[in-house]
């Protein structure tokens, strides 16, 4: 097991899958769930070497989920240095109509807090589709922001903001309340 630890993981685990009891039994009791994406995330956390880094795509359900999801988020803050989350709009249409998130963390480093950045649709774009997919250039503003992370407020709503660990705990680990898309608040 220890020989298979890795320095870097970049992953897009399957969303919405349900694992049976035989698979769940391979995980510590506090992390047992049938949700495939959650189990993949826990596995990635265990496979990282100390100071190993991970970037992972997760569905919005992880952001607001409680129970095992909250336990995973707590562990990410306490021991895995979760530092940045990029909130994405629905980028996988027509295959999946779910908002997704990019989470970045480093094993063995407690989090001081988490930067959240909401990546809105570009001007004039109402959705990404098979014929009009999200492109690398749509991340240009994220890359600019990442180089010098600063809070951003657009029309009175947080687009980018740093949340302390205490603030995230006070939200009961409901990361969905951090820089949500405007239509989600209405």
What residue ranges belong to the model's regions?
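A conserved structural/catalytic subdomain of Rossmann-like adenosyl-cofactor enzymes
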Residues: 1-186
């Amino acid at each position: 097991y220890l020989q298979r630890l890795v320095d870097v993981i970049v992953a897009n685990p399957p969303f919405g899958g349900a694992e049976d009891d035989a698979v769940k039994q391979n995980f510590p009791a506090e992390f047992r769930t049938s949700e495939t994406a959650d189990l993949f995330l826990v596995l990635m956390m265990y496979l990282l070497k100390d100071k190993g880094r991970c970037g992972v795509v997760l569905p919005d359900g992880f952001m607001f989920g409680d129970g095992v999801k909250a336990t995973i988020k707590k562990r990410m803050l306490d021991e895995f240095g979760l530092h940045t989350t990029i909130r994405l709009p629905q980028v996988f249409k027509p295959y999946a109509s779910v908002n997704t998130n990019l989470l970045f963390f480093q094993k063995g480093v407690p989090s001081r807090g988490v930067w959240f950045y909401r990546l809105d649709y570009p001007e004039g774009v109402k959705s990404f589709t098979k014929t009009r997919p999200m492109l690398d250039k749509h991340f240009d503003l994220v890359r600019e922001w990442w180089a010098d992370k600063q809070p951003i407020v657009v029309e009175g709503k947080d687009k980018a903001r740093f949340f302390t660990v205490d603030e995230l705990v006070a939200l009961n680990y409901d990361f969905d309340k951090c820089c949500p898309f405007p239509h989600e608040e209405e």
